[in-house]
Amino acid sequence: MEYKFDFVTKSNRYNNKYFAMDILEKLRNDSELAEKLKTVCDVDILDELKEPDDYDGHLTFNIQGKAFGRDASGSEYILLDDGTVSYVGSEGQSGRMAESIEDFFELVVNCPYWIDCLNKELYKNTGKLNKKIIELEEECLEEEYEEDGTSLKEVQRELAAGLGIELVENVADILIKFYESGNRKPRFIVTFKENDGSNTHGSGILFN
């Protein structure tokens, strides 16, 4: 049986650009919290909002925005003009991640392994999704993130408290919100202009 997930819009408070600026500024001013976010969630907050990398004019975007962070591969997290957050991968994949900056941090803190949950088959029923979550959490829990041996769960609690977001028990709910946001329209489309002048349009969906 395939589950159907209804998209629910967040309140304006969480789409408010002022809230986004507040949480980003907090991270810029708290190097310890920012380092934990970088180490555990692979989100390196930029010193300021910047134009997304257009690869020397080869990339264009159907929704404008500013990059606020990068991961270790050079992929960018972009706060779009409509208040949503999208991902532009260094290997060409791109799409919306979250309906607001709060939803974005809720996702990466609760699910630092989100990038391993892009198989759309996982979302056909909750059993598959929960099984994948258990597997990934077991892998993550084996890792130590601090010199003193601090566990993933401990760092997640610190990040959630520092960012003022909820650390949830049912991670599947967070991933379902991610899936809903990533599949709704209008999609975030990245177009690559080839050297011969032709264009290649992305699907606007991270899931495959």
Residue ranges and their predicted role:
Residues 91-128:
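Compact, glycine/acidic-enriched structural inserts
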Residues 1-92, 123, 138-208:
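A surface-exposed partner-binding patch
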